[in-house]
Amino acid sequence: MGFNINIIGTGGTRPLHNRYLSSVLIEYDGDNFLFDCGEGTQMSLRKQKISWQKIKMICITHLHADHITGLLGIVMLMSQSGETRKEPLIIAGPVGIKNYTQANINMLKIYKNYEIIYKEIIIDKTEKIIYEDKTKKIEYTKLKHSIECVGYLFIEKDKPGKFNTEKAEELNIPKGPIRKALQDGKEILVNGKIIKPSEILGKSKKGLKVAYITDTGYFKELIQQIKNFNLVIIESTFKNELKKEADKKLHLTAGGAANIVKQAKVLQTGLIHFSERYTLRKDLENLLKEAKLEHPDGEIFLTRDGMRLEANKNNFIIK
């Protein structure tokens, strides 16, 4: 339970022996949300002892192979793991995600004993919120890449403050559903008097905001979308010396990623989606150095396969 983030993979283009393709799983009070699903994702999930059966929703950023080729394996395994899913699997992504998935299911004759709900995103037209319940919501944000691509914003809703039982007794508010309504932020009517939640509840706790941003080139609009986020996991594909290549391919350098989060005043930043050319630890450490040179006051770190981050007040602790 709680609010945790598991780094499933951190690479780009192709998996390496010690680095799977970029993928992140967010756990929130028993609900699991997977962001991107490249080749080898199921292997990394298995290594981290994370059940794919517990994945509620898979959010794909774009239809490039290194972000999607692991999807069908997980779709198949959900029907072959010895237990039946009790709820549908939600799959979200840009237009084409449904055709890609269904065509492969049909062509490969994949046995499936559960429902899939597709949420295809038509950028700038589809409602920004693609998932919402009482405690959280997921929004998409447009990215700048060679094909239609979106980032995802995981937003925890503000939590109500402490319920003042003495005040409730004083105002003759009966126990039960009517008190629950106040805790849900609704006004109630007691003895002809309207009572607002603010009269009974203490100060609310601000919810945490997490963004998953890859693949993209630099563009100013992104800064506003992740303004003041608690944690942004953002691509850092190239070293600064390859800025021309990054700009051409619509990717970010380490310095470019740091510049974005600096302007957005992000609290914590995790770098991800490292080029396959960076195979040594020192290569990745150089990416981190370049990011910190651009944003020396920022809390920036390298993500790694198997890393786990746990929510703690207004930030995340690396485990």
Swiss-Prot record:
Its EC number is 3.1.26.11. Pfam families: Lactamase_B (PF00753), Lactamase_B_2 (PF12706). It comes from the Bacteria. Binds 2 Zn(2+) ions. It catalyses: Endonucleolytic cleavage of RNA, removing extra 3' nucleotides from tRNA precursor, generating 3' termini of tRNAs. A 3'-hydroxy group is left at the tRNA terminus and a 5'-phosphoryl group is left at the trailer molecule. Zn(2+) 2 binds at residues 66-67, 215, 273. Homodimer. HAMAP family: RNase_Z_BN (MF_01818). Zinc phosphodiesterase, which displays some tRNA 3'-processing endonuclease activity. Probably involved in tRNA maturation, by removing a 3'-trailer from precursor tRNA. This is Ribonuclease Z. It comes from Borreliella burgdorferi (strain ATCC 35210 / DSM 4680 / CIP 102532 / B31). The lineage of its organism: Bacteria, Pseudomonadati, Spirochaetota, Spirochaetia, Spirochaetales.
